[in-house]
Amino acid sequence: MNLNILVILIFFTTVIGTFAIAQTNTSAQDQVELGETYKKADYGSWSLRCVRTNLEIDPCELFQILRNSSGSPVVEFTMLDFEPNASVIAGANVITPLETLLTSQLIVKIGDEASQSYPFAFCLKMGCVARIGLTETDLKRYKEGESATVIIVPANAPDSPQKLSLSLSGFTAGYAALIAN
């Protein structure tokens, strides 16, 4: 009799344990409400962030937060998936603090390449946005580079540009995942 009870207990423990494990292995995206953002994956210094929708595939973006020397978040650099046109094949939005000197533009320098300047398009409560259109050559630089420097100028300290490091570690894999999504 005791053997039968033991067998039944082992059976139910195994079944219940398997069920509990299956319940705890649900992905982050399955637990997100419609309209909420979730992190789908990390690629080196980049993260693939998506918004839960009713669509078959949730829209995503590849992003990285740039921090100053004291570790505070300063800039959000976001790569977007969009339909390429004649010369621009990729795009990015870069959000800087509201106190950025807009006339100085956003400057991006990849490795030893010449720096490129981008005008700010608009400002919102969360910050000022520069939109970057990338050509095939530009995108190749991001994929082949190790790091880039993003330079913004604080409005209250125009003689002290702030240089922030943009890691390109994981960019190629992250961008491939963005496009494949």
Language-model features: where?
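Positively charged n-region of N-terminal signal peptides that target proteins for export
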Residues: 1-5
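Bacterial N-terminal signal peptides
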Residues: 7-17
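A generic "folded-domain core" signal
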Residues: 22-181
